[in-house]
Amino acid sequence: MAQQETAGGVLLIAASILALIFANSYLSGFYNGVLNLPLVVAIGAFEISKPLLLWVNDGLMALFFLMVGLEVKREVLEGHLSQPSQVVLPGLAALAGVAFPAIIYASFNWQDPTALRGWAIPSATDIAFALGVFSLFGRHLPVSLKLFLLSVAIFDDIAAIVIIALFYSHELSTLSLLVAGIGIVMLFVLNRLKIRHVSPFMFVGLVVWAAVLKSGVHATLAGFVIAWFIPLKHKNIHDEPMLLSLEHALQPWVAYFILPFFAFVNAGVHLGGIGLDTLTAPVTLGIIVGLFVGKQLGIFSVCWLSIKLRIAKLPEGATWRELYGVCLLAGIGFTMSLFIGSLAFEGANSEMVASVKLGVLFGSLLSAICGALILTNSRKIK
């Protein structure tokens, strides 16, 4: 698992660098042409027509959220989030880690209603990237810190799901929502019947995803909802727990293909026309400061206060310095921040999109470098 996290993190970095190379070379025309390549799926009168970029953001990312949902369900029902005492510190930390960056972003953009739509961009944490950096530079650290980072990221993902549902959905289609609701009821029935094949769940899940896509609610939410109806303990035809089997099957696809591909199609920003105005734009600065300062400030201050008030305990075997390094890693928003940015500024002008991408790249990079330095040097200070 640690090897997969490390390799996945390296692939994310490589995909992002490749995207920047494509976007800033003679290949930029080809790159943009591929992103805007129209793809159509039609069955009778039902049709989904989207460019490749949106198939990745709406389709492949739904599989990512399916895996997140499976992980959350397992951890909440029988993992290290099943005990209330284990939930307090990461739960409070994640709440502050969402609120502080959002407030900082809003303070930079409060005079621009359009820019304010991006308030949630610096509130996200890229769980794959953060764990990848931790696996590279925190191998000597106690496992409790990794569990803390994972727990914070899980709560962060739940917050992202709620934010997307409440603030980044469009006009709703009653008929599509009804179809999605019927599909969810069918998933519940399949769960209660203890069906041992995963294929019926996936077929109904595909219908739910398509209905949610057409409903105006963001389609990625379907993946998270579907996950909660996959049986936790019922065994499949291979005599393995169905949820765990599906989670393990999805993990390499997410780590080695979905997230790197998402990074490749979303991280490419043309740097040629970018000047000081773009770098110092309120949107860019709000995201950079939100990710790099807001995340670490929110999470670490709430952890310090909770531990000093004896509401929670410092992760077992960890020092304050090591905890601070992990708090820095939570500022790696990368793919999740880019994803929320694509929702917040869908159809926006190229300057706004460039500001979002630059802010996310710089904020995430600062958090990753500083977090890695703190974690690496912590072994020398002990």
Curated annotation (Swiss-Prot):
Family note: Belongs to the NhaA Na(+)/H(+) (TC 2.A.33) antiporter family.
Subcellular locations according to the entry: Cell inner membrane
Gene Ontology MF terms in the entry: sodium:proton antiporter activity
GO BP field: regulation of pH
TM stretches of this protein: 7-27, 28-48, 52-72, 88-108, 118-138, 147-167, 170-190, 206-226, 254-274, 285-305, 325-345, 356-376
Organism lineage: Bacteria, Pseudomonadati, Pseudomonadota, Gammaproteobacteria, Cellvibrionales
Cellular component GO terms, alphabetical: plasma membrane
The encoding gene: nhaA2
Role summary: Na(+)/H(+) antiporter that extrudes sodium in exchange for external protons.
Catalytic activity: Na(+)(in) + 2 H(+)(out) = Na(+)(out) + 2 H(+)(in)
Highest taxon above the source species: Bacteria
Alphabetical UniProt keywords: Antiport, Cell inner membrane, Cell membrane, Ion transport, Membrane, Sodium, Sodium transport, Transmembrane, Transmembrane helix, Transport
UniProt name for this protein: Na(+)/H(+) antiporter NhaA 2
Mode of membrane association: Multi-pass membrane protein
